[in-house]
UniProtKB/Swiss-Prot annotation:
The lineage of its organism: Bacteria, Pseudomonadati, Campylobacterota, Epsilonproteobacteria, Campylobacterales. This is Small ribosomal subunit protein bS18. Part of the 30S ribosomal subunit. Forms a tight heterodimer with protein bS6. Binds as a heterodimer with protein bS6 to the central domain of the 16S rRNA, where it helps stabilize the platform of the 30S subunit. Gene3D superfamilies: Ribosomal protein S18. The gene is rpsR. GO terms for cellular component: cytosolic small ribosomal subunit. It comes from Campylobacter curvus (strain 525.92). Belongs to the bacterial ribosomal protein bS18 family.
């Protein structure tokens, strides 16, 4: 039988920084929860708490609606650092 993987405990970046509100215009806060294709990453990968994950999701959806963050990225346009040009 294969051995179980041991993962290190992930901590919420937003609770450590004591952030009350996540603004949709602040892309530097949102980049921790986005993949290289601008998909919202799940809590188990980012380590954010439930409260902040809901706030981040809402802020990302608002930023997409305001055209600050793109909805989708083609395979050709995938970059290593998605926030270089912003």
């Amino acid at each position: 039988m294969a051995e179980k993987r041991k993962y290190s405990r992930k901590y919420c970046k937003y609770t450590e920084a004591k952030i009350d509100f996540i603004d949709y215009k602040d892309t530097s806060l949102l980049k921790y929860c986005l993949s290289e294709r601008f998909k919202i990453m799940p809590r188990r990968l980012t380590g954010t708490s439930k409260k902040y994950q809901e706030m981040v999701e809402k802020a990302i959806k608002r930023a997409r609606h305001a055209a600050i963050i793109p909805y989708i990225v083609d395979r050709k346009d995938v970059v290593t650092n998605p926030f270089e040009g912003i």
